[in-house]
Swiss-Prot record:
Name recorded for this polypeptide: Alpha-elapitoxin-Lh2a
Alphabetized InterPro entries for the sequence: Snake_3FTx (IPR003571), Snake_toxin-like_sf (IPR045860), Snake_toxin_con_site (IPR018354), Toxin_cobra-type (IPR054131)
Job description of the protein: Binds with high affinity to muscular (alpha-1/CHRNA1) and neuronal (alpha-7/CHRNA7) nicotinic acetylcholine receptor (nAChR) and inhibits acetylcholine from binding to the receptor, thereby impairing neuromuscular and neuronal transmission.
Tissue specificity field: Expressed by the venom gland.
Organism of this sequence: Hydrophis hardwickii
Pfam name, any one: Toxin_cobra-type
Entry keyword annotation includes Signal: yes
Amino acid sequence: MKTLLLTLVVVTIVCLDLGDSLSCYLGYKRSQTCPPGEKVCFVKSWCDAFCGSRGKRIEMGCAATCPTVKDGIDITCCATDNCNTYANWGSG
């Protein structure tokens, strides 16, 4: 009986710990668990000198809050696992 109770306690602790973490994409379909305190996934996109030939620059990751919007930078934030996909990834 004690073993069963101990097992239930351990499973509960593990499940609570796993439920508190967030995973975000950091690059092309490369996901990572966010550090403690970072509860938002984001995608930043902007044009640089090579935008015409290479497309927009993309930065992805985790943050404590949604990054501040600046001129010429598009930012999208979300708060579920791997929600910060990039539309141009396609289906491959």
